[in-house]
Amino acid sequence: MTAFFECGPFSARDGEGHVLFEDVSLSLSDGQCVAIEGPSGGGKSTLLRYLTGLAWSPDAGRGLDGVDYPCAQLPVWRSLVTLIAQDAPMIAGSLRDNLRFPFSQRAGKGRGFDDGEAVRLLESVGLGRLPLDREIRTLSGGERHRIALVRGLMWDPSVLVADETLSGLDPEAVTASFDLLLAFARRPGRLVICVFHDPALNARADRHLRLANGRLEEVR
């Protein structure tokens, strides 16, 4: 059976020339949440950038749902395999401006933005009290992390890649946000790949991988 998501092999070194990982590939089915953990500085964020096409490797293959995406089609790949970055970058403007931002780009042409869906998802992560016209600069780091998650879910990519998106949240917000990720992941034709440092979250994922000593290995 052909895997839903196939990517690699990737190799990377840090700024001092030390190997972060070597010949790492992923072959994953849809309808699941895959957690990746490992020591700090071990290359997890770098690997996610390769998976999403934000870092380029000329020798790596990329396939999604039976379709290959060569390097010339990286912009298409990036619209289908979306990264929620660890620092939750935002643009100047309102909460609505930030949620709408992907839809204003070339890849989002023709895709509608639904205020009602935005409010529903914000309520699901405990931010229902925030009006959509609230200035983003007035929000805390934890609120921005949850807004970045909502933005990724609204974009509805085939593969959602989350880099420590739930870091710094209170336990209630972590549970609510992870439940949303799981619900998204369990849909046919969807996949979530995430990095957590929380053993409880790794245990709830459908698959648990560990990146350490340059290798990506199955934990369960």
What residue spans do the PLM features occupy?
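Catalytic Walker B motif of ABC-type/P-loop ATPase nucleotide-binding domains
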Residues: L160-E164
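ABC ATPase C-loop
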Residues: G152-L153
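ABC ATPase NBD Q-loop/coupling interface
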Residues: G61-V76
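Conserved catalytic motifs of ABC-family nucleotide-binding domains
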Residues: D87-F101, A107-K109
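The feature captures the beta-strand-to-loop junction immediately N-terminal to the Walker
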Residues: E37-P39
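Conserved ABC ATPase "signature" region
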Residues: F113-P131
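Helix-to-loop junction immediately C-terminal to a conserved catalytic motif
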Residues: T52
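Conserved ABC ATPase signature
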Residues: E135-L139, E143
